Amino acid sequence: MATYIVGDVHGCFDELQALLELAQFKKNKDQLWITGDLVGRGPKSLETLRFVKSLGDSAKIVLGNHDLHLLAIHQGIHSDKESDKLSALLNAPDCDELLTWLRFQPLFRRHPEFNFVMVHAGISPQWTIQQAQGYAQEVQNILQGNEFKKLLKNMYGNHPASWNDSSQGIKRLRFIINALTRMRYCLLDGSLEFYSKLAPEQTDSTIIKPWFEINTLDQSSDIIFGHWAALLGTGTKQGIYALDTGCVWGNSLSMLRWQDKKMFSFACQRQRVHSK
């Protein structure tokens, strides 16, 4: 059994299928891990969710910020924008079933055999990996319970920027969600910084650094993440794997086979799109 880990799909269903064919993925034998953001901005979010759900236990995903945003749209908390390209999914007869399945997916996964963990955006340098797993479970318990709508309504915002283990309620949950699904840069003390969208080489490293460059980062396990398409899979230290290579932006979809660390890539077949 091979373990394949693919970066953010964002509804790029055709590219995902081509990539799996290229790697000779066997759905009844192999496992497919996905770094989150299955949906949003790409043309086939509905087909992507249906396919991944159909894989059953062969698929292991974590939730990304776009997946959480989709859940909020479905609950009427936010409106569906044309740029999200989610209308086909939201109007599908199996939408409720698909999004219930999505809501019960985790924010953090640890492989039971290999020494790696997978999250969408990263692990806060103010946490250990073991703490991150526990904090993710706090959010999952609410997301999978009766109070999930309240959580989805109040998860938006950039504060608090620094972790305080004594914090409670939505501030605590928002930090956990932001660290696991939105984080790119941190201040040197490990607090979250959401205002810079530049590539790392264009930033002042005496003020902010990529989260994986903060020296307090726990690397007791390898860390696999997506989210940060501008990295194009490069620039991380040993044991840190960035797999979002910006397929939805016109670049490519990338997938790592863990056993031999072979990387597979398939170029986007559509016209390049631009962020607004």
UniProtKB/Swiss-Prot annotation:
UniProtKB keywords: Hydrolase
CDD domains in UniProt: MPP_ApaH
Lineage: superkingdom: Bacteria
EC number: 3.6.1.41
Signal peptide: none
Coiled-coil segments: none
SUPFAM superfamilies: Metallo-dependent phosphatases
Name of the top EC class for this enzyme: hydrolase
Single GO MF annotation: bis(5'-nucleosyl)-tetraphosphatase (symmetrical) activity
One Pfam family recorded for the sequence: Metallophos
HAMAP family referenced in this protein's UniProt entry, alphabetically: ApaH
Family: Belongs to the Ap4A hydrolase family.
Protein name: Bis(5'-nucleosyl)-tetraphosphatase, symmetrical
Lineage: Bacteria, Pseudomonadati, Pseudomonadota, Gammaproteobacteria, Alteromonadales
